[in-house]
């Protein structure tokens, strides 16, 4: 497995692959890898000849410097996992390689349709950071395919819009959420949970599934459903952040024309911000 840290070496390698008519899959990550990331890699491998995993803790995606400093850096362990998984290349650049100048003077990429709603309201500037680093990676790697998890549903919609708007010739694959046996969605941030918090964390998915079941049964009193879910989470010891039911295509409030809904939940448990979602076909 190649471990590359600089754009010139990366470009040289992917150019050679392209000349050999190899399809390339890109899996962007911030490291601290788990089985959810492995599912992305497997999805990429099923669709391409070469798999590139980027490992870069993007400072533009963090609201607070202390959160950036606390994010786990586990590159050696990550590379060991990726070698076992048969990844062809890890691109692990230093921050100064990706952002050689001060961030205040950095050129940014923005996707206003999805950047300033829901998660974007809670985390100002976060999606601008995502769009900027993903655009850089797309330009450097020139992938045929890129894989993203459905756990971060808004991010997936956001990336698809970015690809449309910027005319990238890249197939975006959404990979289903990987869960622990008790239903908790796998996340690098689950490592922030204490043993007791980890015991409580599956309540997020359990409350979500109860709400989804009601939607599938035809319940459409959205405010009532969300109020009940909020109360259940509070009783379970979680602090609800974002609980919404939206059109799965537009992420706007449901209308009479909505065919599919997505239920988006985020809640705090200790220092961890948990994220989960589920899609529902609406009964006409």
UniProtKB/Swiss-Prot annotation:
Top-rank taxon, per record: Bacteria
Catalytic residues of the enzyme: 37
GO biological process: pantothenate biosynthetic process
Major localization listed first in the record, in broad terms: cytoplasm
Gene Ontology CC: cytosol
Record InterPro entries: Cyt_trans-like, Pantoate_ligase, Pantoate_ligase_C, Rossmann-like_a/b/a_fold
Residues annotated for (R)-pantoate binding in this entry: 61, 155
The keyword Ligase is assigned to this record: yes
Residues that bind beta-alanine: 61
Pathway, per record: Cofactor biosynthesis; (R)-pantothenate biosynthesis; (R)-pantothenate from (R)-pantoate and beta-alanine: step 1/1
Enzyme Commission code(s) on record: 6.3.2.1
UniProt binding sites for ATP: 30-37, 149-152, 178, 186-189
UniProt entry keywords in alphabetical sequence: ATP-binding, Cytoplasm, Ligase, Nucleotide-binding, Pantothenate biosynthesis
MF GO annotations: ATP binding; pantoate-beta-alanine ligase activity
SUPFAM superfamilies to which the protein is assigned, alphabetical: Nucleotidylyl transferase
NCBIfam families named among the record's database cross-references: cyt_tran_rel, panC
Entry similarity comment: Belongs to the pantothenate synthetase family.
Other facts noted in the record for this chain: The reaction proceeds by a bi uni uni bi ping pong mechanism.
Subunit and interaction comment: Homodimer.
Name of the protein: Pantothenate synthetase
Species per Swiss-Prot/TrEMBL record: Sodalis glossinidius (strain morsitans)
Gene that encodes the chain: panC
């Amino acid at each position: 497995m190649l471990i590359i840290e600089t754009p010139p070496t990366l470009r040289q390698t992917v150019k050679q692959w392209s000349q050999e008519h190899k399809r390339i899959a890109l899996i962007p990550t911030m490291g601290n890898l788990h089985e959810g990331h492995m599912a992305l890699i497997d999805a990429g491998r099923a669709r391409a000849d070469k798999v590139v995993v980027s490992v870069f803790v993007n400072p533009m995606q963090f609201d607070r410097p202390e959160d950036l400093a606390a994010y786990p850096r586990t590159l050696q362990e990550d590379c060991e996992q990726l070698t076992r998984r048969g990844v062809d290349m890890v691109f692990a650049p230093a921050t100064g390689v990706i952002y050689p100048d001060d961030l205040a003077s950095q050129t940014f990429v923005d996707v206003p349709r999805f950047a300033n709603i829901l998660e974007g309201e809670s985390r100002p500037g976060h999606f601008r950071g995502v769009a900027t680093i993903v655009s850089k990676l797309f330009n450097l790697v020139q992938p045929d395919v890129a894989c993203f998890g459905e756990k971060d549903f808004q991010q997936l919609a956001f990336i698809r819009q970015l690809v449309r708007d910027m005319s990238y010739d890249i197939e975006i694959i959404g990979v289903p959420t990987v869960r622990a046996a008790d239903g908790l969605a796998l996340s690098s941030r689950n490592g922030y949970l204490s043993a007791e918090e980890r015991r409580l964390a599956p309540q997020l998915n359990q409350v979500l599934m109860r709400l989804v079941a009601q939607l599938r049964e035809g319940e459409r009193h959205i405010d009532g459903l969300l109020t009940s879910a909020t109360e259940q989470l509070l009783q379970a010891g979680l602090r609800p952040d974002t609980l919404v039911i939206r059109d799965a295509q537009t992420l706007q409030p449901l209308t009479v024309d909505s065919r599919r809904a997505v239920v988006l939940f985020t809640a705090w448990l200790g220092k961890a911000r948990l994220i989960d979602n589920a899609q529902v076909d609406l009964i006409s």
